[in-house]
């Protein structure tokens, strides 16, 4: 046998490189912090200077010349006459003292100047050329100082006009930081300090009685015209965005204050109400209740809106036209603002180029040692193709290179360790000490218990050990305590401690005292595909997954399981078949974070080798890497529950429910999928899921990634663009590749965020292209212009004579490159390529639904929504009377089954219509019941009963099929779709109840039972929890590791025959709980106990000397929680003392897995020795 230490040495070398990368990133962060401190210092100086100017101006206003003070009874229109003189005299003391000439506004000859505190903050940064722009800063007269000051005192502090009063309450540092941290799309800081929202500003300004100037009333047309210039054509859609024009008018650098007549227009404009028709609920309107309506109620609400606005066709056409025009107008307006800001050099730097790293002595020494290590093992350096080939050249800001290098290193570590452990397992298999068991069928007993017994059995026997154990039972003295974390598995053996991924097979004490664990497929993907039914073993779900992964690693029995599990019940539609098959095939992508960061960085082995010093040095890097991994933060921990799934069918159903939730609300869908363990809770894992999984709407992917309010979404977007390689591609072709995965449309802010991230990545991949421009932000402007061009060119609402021409496109990009023009041949090439081929996203499941919808005549229900998926299409025959024989050809129906809807169509004659189908009726699946029937007339019949919305009546439909196979296939798909939509509705109701009632305290739940069974009766989860509540609660021990680890409850008591639960002792008639003797503490926890956890905060790696000292502490820590856990379980008020316990006879169900933020519980291994087999072949702990 070859040397087994060769590949671990490679892993150590890879970890050294990983540590060096982390150190480089830390040094870069330190440098950036120093720069930030320097910027803050300069900002404080600038704020202090502005403060002194403002105080001096206030002093001048407090003591004006006597001739300039008008009488208090003077009318307000007389103010403009004296305002220029007042402003001119106010400037003289400033110029005499040597202050900047731009500190005070220069009066215009024809109108009074207006002053705002935002103008004072920006003036020190402007050059001499700012004189022309300074008088146009809106909002306030400086004339009639006394009258204006009285007006300011009467106004509330939230009004825009109270700029001077607000400045008195703000420190200079706060004012300066507000300017620095403003959003890029805000060109001025008019509303940074005084207005919470633009609507409030406009409303208050419109209600004012003359304090706000009317000089800006004529700016409305200029705002619309400026936005139309960005699109390269006259202002066609200006009336549709009139309300937003008035709302955002004050934010433009040259716009005046809102006129008093703008108030009624702002309130009565239909432009604010019509877009709500397409979305059913206006996102900006203050909602009276946060309760989320169900899908049928939302559809009913849209139907009522359509009826209110003139019917289905008229209202929908108007809503689509208005929404499209308004979004295009907003994009054009944003582009105009960004372009003007760039021309005036006021746009903050968006695209940051990587900088060359200066080599230090430490970095050179580390690189040299790493080079020697690679030469020792004969491996080439792993480098990203987008990075320069020189080793000491340009390791830079690590915004993209850090991720790429970590991925490559993680893959190399996994390969090295899996190769080594494969040799070890094969050698053990040859010696007869290790056996593999093929995955059984769904009806047979799960291999979880047997696999669990085989894993310690193969790990336990070393030289001279006795391996004769009863099959299916774990050995009594295996000497291990395994904690299967969500991302990391820590195995504490008698002689060492090893850390590896949670989806690894432990082969402990192999070849002496070495501990080896083989990384394999992540558990999430295995459970989705259903290649193994190890999830059915409630006592050890992690071990069952590990053994299934071991079977794959040795390539023995995974083929049959993959063939059985990869086929979903819904195979009529190709998209659905690919979706369910991909669930198991792409497991690496679904848990890519585990493979690339978590599992690779936690693969440190404390093996007997000559490289113990290097291994110990990498332990610190391992711990730091684990702690520094960004995680998804669950906003509602009560909804982040992870129930155990006993069957593959239920697992697949929950996965589809997660996809539906994502297509309805992306944030909730990601939260659901993470809590159920389908995807990792790290940005890179979610990024792989979004890029490589089918069943996700491209539109909703863009909605999720464009949400800049949440840091996690921004991190996922960065990881998504890092996965794309735009090297040696034209900008429009790279944008085409980006938009193929993500649909870039919707709100202007989200589109801008997506384009910004794309531009950043493009600059990283093509530094030679960026060098052709004066400013890297030109790439961002050009990409934004390409999106506008594509929208304008292919929008059906724009007439051909109004579409953007080549000269318009060139004129829009004139002078954006720091005053220089983009080369004409580059712009012409982009325009011609966009004209030849549209930028559009790849097909998704909505594409097939849209094709079906276009082929239907008379369809009132909107089919093409992001969450709707076509399941199957069957040809059935409608039966009007089941007791009469009828001609089947006269009632032939094409039944399209969607995941939430059943659409019944009939074929159209080809001569009369170009369409394929005529709409008959559509019924929802929620609440639907079906029953098969057979009589002398119809041998394969089915009856559908659907409740009518808003009524207690029910609709009954009868169908029959020609053959039993077709009917059986339709019934299976229908049954699964009804269960899916019912479970989805139950989950929605549970979330809403938790949101309305607040987060439920888990301490009031009986011994780890999750949720309130009364709120979800009838669901599979409720049945499991009902059985769990009546199980014995004795011999449970609570373990808390940093208050973040979680586990499932393992019960040790024996149940009655056929799963009849035994009532807990505290529920039987007994004296009060105060008089019951306390439960004795259990003995120290023996080894061989499995504890499943959900999340890990800190990993402590111990060597042999430390282990001897830690074992008594560990046993003491486990035993100290016995009384408190038993007391909490016994004191739960399940029923009054002496109340009878209702015993129900039902098959045992596995306990739910750990929820987040729940006490860590496990049971000593004695309870795992009693497995009872039932007639169904399944095993249970009861």
UniProtKB/Swiss-Prot annotation:
It comes from the Eukaryota. Residues 315-344 form the IQ domain. Residues 63-78, 1061-1087, 1147-1157 have a biased composition (Pro residues). The modification Phosphoserine is found at residue 259. Residues 1043-1052 have a biased composition (Polar residues). Pfam families: IQ_SEC7_PH, Sec7. GO terms for cellular component: cytosol; GABA-ergic synapse; glycinergic synapse; inhibitory synapse; nucleoplasm; postsynaptic density; postsynaptic membrane; postsynaptic specialization of symmetric synapse. Expressed specifically in the adult brain, predominantly in the cerebral cortex and the olfactory bulb, but not in the fetal brain. Expressed only in mature neurons, but not in undifferentiated neural stem precursor cells (NSPCs), nor in glioma cells. Gene3D superfamilies: 1.10.220.20, Arf Nucleotide-binding Site Opener,domain 2, Pleckstrin-homology domain (PH domain)/Phosphotyrosine-binding domain (PTB). GO terms for biological process: actin cytoskeleton organization; regulation of ARF protein signal transduction. Residues 644-837 form the SEC7 domain. It is found in: Cytoplasm; Postsynaptic density. Residues 572-581 have a biased composition (Acidic residues). CDD domains: bZIP (cd14686), PH_IQSEC (cd13318), Sec7 (cd00171). Acts as a guanine nucleotide exchange factor (GEF) for ARF1. Interacts with DLG1 and DLG4. Interacts with GPHN. This is IQ motif and SEC7 domain-containing protein 3. The gene is IQSEC3.
